[in-house]
């Protein structure tokens, strides 16, 4: 569980930490924009600093999302204009594009396959016009056509719902609180040591508290991730039909054990299939609950 949490928050944490350290060094050297003056903390200056670091960090992560997913998951993008595709690959591209057009998209998402025995798929990208839908080789091997259709419709719904942008805004708010609170906590900690040790203690405490608050903040992100899955299920049902969407979820349930727990879970929130049992740290709600809600639709 600790590894899953760590991998999920790693990219975002590294970005905001790097930006925060760079800005802290700049303000320390130049004195411009410093939120600590004469040993006292300027809360308004710190809030502005936190907003800049928090939202810049989250939008950098958003901009990198498609490239990062391709790199970390080893996604092979299928482009009929530049390469010869097999019948199965061409059929996958055609299905994604057909569902995308049905959803009102004018710019078709990239379509890719990543090699993994897990039965899974994900969608990502900074915008509807720069999106990616990728499926695992295990999904194509194990699922029938109706189930694949339901999964792809679910992923297209994520794109048209703008889930990545909404997630970025939420992450920006979480980041702001993480940066703000971690620096206040670090400042308080530095007050309990000798003056010559205060800068070192402040820096170390800032990093430690930032990690702790990031883990706590991830609970909010995970909760939203679970919430958005229900919306994507409904959107998938509208595109592919309720029966296909329910069939896809039931098929996923039978292959839940094939989810790769050692995979690069920094993209775990993007996937359709999560762990079998839901918890506070789950990115996906329980599959039985997802099926129940669709059946009641």
Swiss-Prot record:
InterPro entries: HtpX_protease, Pept_M48_protease_HtpX, Peptidase_M48
Family: Belongs to the peptidase M48B family.
GO molecular function: metalloendopeptidase activity; zinc ion binding
Keywords: Cell membrane, Hydrolase, Membrane, Metal-binding, Metalloprotease, Protease, Transmembrane, Transmembrane helix, Zinc
Cofactor needs: Zn(2+)
Organism: Bacillus velezensis (strain DSM 23117 / BGSC 10A6 / LMG 26770 / FZB42)
Sites where the protein binds Zn(2+): 154, 158, 229
Subcellular location: Cell membrane
Record's bilayer topology term: Multi-pass membrane protein
Protein name: Protease HtpX homolog
Gene3D superfamilies assigned: Metalloproteases ('zincins'), catalytic domain
Listed transmembrane segments: 5-25, 43-63, 169-189, 203-223
Residues annotated as the enzyme's active site: 155
Cofactor binding note of this UniProt entry: Binds 1 zinc ion per subunit.
PANTHER family associated with the record: PROTEASE HTPX
Its EC number(s): 3.4.24.-
Any one cellular-component term (Gene Ontology): plasma membrane
Keyword 4Fe-4S tagged: no
GO BP annotation list: proteolysis
Lineage: Bacteria, Bacillati, Bacillota, Bacilli, Bacillales
Domain of life of the native organism: Bacteria
One Pfam family this sequence matches: Peptidase_M48
